[in-house]
Every structure is written in C-alpha cells, then in structure tokens.
Amino acid sequence: MRSSYRLALAGVAAAALLAVGCSSSGSSGSSSGGANWATETSASGGGGMTALVAAAKKEGTLNVIALPPTWANYGAILSAFTAKYGIKINSALPDGSSQQEVQAVKTEHGTAKAPDVLDVGMAVALANTTLFTPYQVSSWSDIPTAQKEPTGLWYQDYGGYMAVGYSSKFGTITSLNDLLSPKFKGAVALNGNPTSANAALNGVMMANLAEGGSPGSIADGVAFFKKLKAAGNFSPVQATGATIKAGTTPVVFNWDYLNLPSYVGVSNWKVFIPQNAVLGGYYAQAINKGAPHPAAARLWEEFLYSQAASGGQNLWLAGGARPVEQAAMQTNGSINTTDAGKLPSVS
C-alpha cells in the first residue's frame, strides 16, 4: 500500500460525526498431546500443524463475527475452510461493525457463543488489545513488520484504497466537490456509522484529505459532510449491496474492493479514487483471548495467511482485496497473477 493511516477514534471526533448525522460452556483449550491451545503462540509451540489440525477438528466448531459473505470473498473463504477441515462455522452478525465485534467479545465472554476470532479496523484493534491473545502464524515473517503487533496480538490481513463508487447516470465524477451538485440530492452514502465502522470512518478521512486536512485532525472531513448534508445530498441510509442494487444509495464511499461492479452487482457502476486523497488501509485479525474454540481459532488464522492457491491470501485477492503477504507472494511466485492484474490501479 502506498499509504495507510493508523487511526484511533477520538471522543471529540466521534461526537462531531454524530452531530453531522453520519451517524457458558467453553473449551479448556487442551488437546491430545498435552498442548494448551488457549495459550500457544504458534503452531510449532503446540506440536506443529498436524497437532493443531487434530485439536481443531476435535473442537469441531469455529465462531466468527461480522463477515458478510460478499465482503472480500469471505463467502468462499468460509466455505473453503469448512470443506478442508470439516469444522462447522457459526457466523454471527454478518453485517456488524468492528465495534460490535469487540462488544460481543465482552458480552459473550465465558460462553460457547463468544467470537473466537475478529476481523476489525485498525482503530478498534489498537484500542482493544487487552481482549486479544498473541499468536504468530506460520507465515509470520512474510507479514511486513509495520503491519503486525510484535507479539502477535493483531496482524493486518487485507486492504485496499478508499473510493467513491457511483452510478454512471451521474456522468463522470472528477472531484469530491462534484458531489455538492443538486443532481446528487439524497444520493451520497457511507457504508456504516463512522463512529463505529472502519470503512465509514475512512470515508470521512478521505474527504478530509481531499479538503486539505491532515492525519492529525478530521475537521475538514467533518466539514465536508456538513456541506453534503446542508445541500440535501447526504443520505443517512447505510449502504449495502441491496441498497445499491435497489438504487437507494447510488453514490457510496467504501473500499475499492467493495466498490467494484462485480461486487455490487450493478453493471453501470463506476469507481473514482481522488488523486489528492489516496487513502489506503488494512483490516486486522485477532484471536479472542477467551475464545471457546482456541485450536480452531488458530487454525483459522493459519488458513487465512496460507499462500496456497486455495489459501486465504489468494482467496482475498480473488475478492479484489490486497492480501498483506502480497509482496512475498509476488517474490515466491505463489500469487494468482490473473487476480492480481484485476486490482484497480492507483497512481
């Protein structure tokens, strides 16, 4: 990625955004062979991948949360994991936010329903490390140093660039200020609430950059959305694939891999990335330190960071997202070059 903000939600910023209107039965962790997977920090530490697979299969279940099947190819990823290991996946709140993920970790703590793993925005990851347990996947060295917590509390997984997706009926957008035109009345939406959803927050940050703001303050981004609202162009509807197909949200701020015509299912969908506001960002994986299925949680991470043709890294790539191990995969030849060639170009 050319650039990436490490964002933290300040209380003042969150309040400002709201003002704009953008708004028990657990596993013990032990397994055959004596490993306590609830505390193991690597597969090798617990006896290797064979032991991890056996322990995860014995648990038989994995709890995930906030993973929409159409988001970054997660539908295929979830199916591939179950097909490979025969482990049942319980998927909760598929359209939930990063903040809802950590809230579930807290409220479901000590129960069999607690999330085993999380996929959260960086602001939420950095603010909640006390909820995570360290684990380093087998391909740890292929994850850039700046994109992981040194002990393995979190590690970035996939990313992209913030973009504006829009119906071609509006013509061609060349600047965010074009969105202030009367023809965009009630059309411009975010993918969630920026006080809790990472994608929506980064949409505001992109506007902040385009308006000349700096990473240290989102005031200019908030001001832009105030102008959108004053013009009657901002829609409070949280954009989804369904709202895009229905024409309810014909202009959407979202990650480029979630703004592709193939993703939204609209053939006349166009994508605009402001060249004065190129904002890249990654999500991050983490394991709940109270995971009810600790071995399955670790096996899931191993699968996601696998560079095999049918592993998580190439499956994310097939969904239009940029996997965190992309550079290493290009070097060792494991990357799917066809899918890599489809990624939107950013200058």
Predicted regions and their residues:
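Bacterial N-terminal signal peptides that target proteins for export
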Residues: 1-12
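A ligand-binding cleft/hinge motif common to bilobed small-molecule-binding domains
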Residues: 123-127, 245, 249-269
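Extracytoplasmic ligand-binding site segments that recognize negatively charged/polar headgroups
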Residues: 63-79, 90-106, 112-248
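Short, polar/charged alpha-helical segment
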Residues: 47-57, 67-88
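Bacterial N-terminal signal peptides
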Residues: 10-20
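Mature extracytoplasmic/periplasmic domains
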Residues: 278-279, 283, 287-346
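Bacterial lipoprotein signal-peptidase II cleavage site
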Residues: 19-33
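Periplasmic-binding protein-like
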Residues: 159-161, 222-227, 233, 265-289, ...
